Amino acid sequence: MAHRHYAVLLFSRASNISPEDPEQDYYIHHYTYVTDKGTDALNYYASSMADHAELIDADTLDELNIEIQRTIDTVTAPDYIIDHLLN
């Protein structure tokens, strides 16, 4: 029986790391937690103190790696924080 694979991606707001230009805020990816246990992933996600977290899953590790990169690219895009946080 195949297991699903899970990842929790943690992001910080750039303004929290270096508050030089808060008008140009965006997310920085800083950690990815990968597991094959759904409850562990959910607990890690729920207890995260990150500014932003994403919980994703896939059938295989290869598919998960693709989704991880796609999520990082989406969340770290300059307009993401404007579209999803400020509106």
Language model features with spans:
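A short, exposed loop/beta-hairpin motif centered on an aromatic-Gly-Thr core
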Residues: E23-K37, A50-T60
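Short, surface-exposed beta-strand/loop "edge" segments at domain boundaries and coil↔beta transitions
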Residues: A14-D21, E63
